[in-house]
Amino acid sequence: MPGIAVKIIDPDTGAELGENEQGLLYCKGASVMIGYLDDPEATSKAITPDGYYNTNDIATVDRNGCIRIVGRMTRFSKIAGEMVPHEMIERRIEELGHLDNLVAVAARPDERKGEQLVVFYAREAKFDKAELLKKMRDSGLPNLWIPRADCFFEVEAIPMLGNGKKDLKKVQAMAKELSEDVF
């Protein structure tokens, strides 16, 4: 992108990553914001001292400078040191179980691995959990990306926003409530 400098940063260490390595996308340039009006705290969280804006997108940059957005940082979990994408797991569950917009993936704390995937599914969703998990394993997903059988939770309905998208804040709040019940 002409006039825009980008870099990919490891979300844990803050180190700049190399070509095709997945991390947080930072950018700066004349058309990139320099801060939040009258909110220095928010500005310091979003803008680095050298002027790069944290997009909160997980991305890679190839040797030609092409940026590939993988997802939003808020839609990833860190499980046993690996970044695990909620949205990709959600799509795979929806595809394999024929459950369009009837599932939502979030995470809750896990003492051993950092976080644990949880799957909420709408009461109207009809599927065989054991069969779905087998299909997920057979589809080539890494084991860390496959939720445990005891981490599927039925809800009346998946919370939705007025625009028809999943209400991810409510989904994450539901996962937080689960963790409060467990820990």
Language model feature labels by segment:
Residues 17-21, 114-116, 165:
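Short glycine/proline-enriched turns and hinge-like loops at secondary-structure junctions
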Residues 77, 106, 118-120, 135-183:
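Conserved C-terminal "lid"/linker of ANL adenylate-forming enzymes
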Residues 18-19, 46, 111-113, 146:
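Short, flexible hinge/linker loops that cap or flank conserved catalytic cores
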Residues 16-18, 62, 68, 161, ...:
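Generic structural signal for well-ordered beta-strand positions
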Residues 1-59, 63-64, 74-76:
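Conserved AMP-binding/adenylate-forming
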Residues 29, 34-35, 56-145:
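AMP-binding/adenylate-forming catalytic core of the ANL superfamily
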Residues 51, 97-100, 156:
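Structural motif
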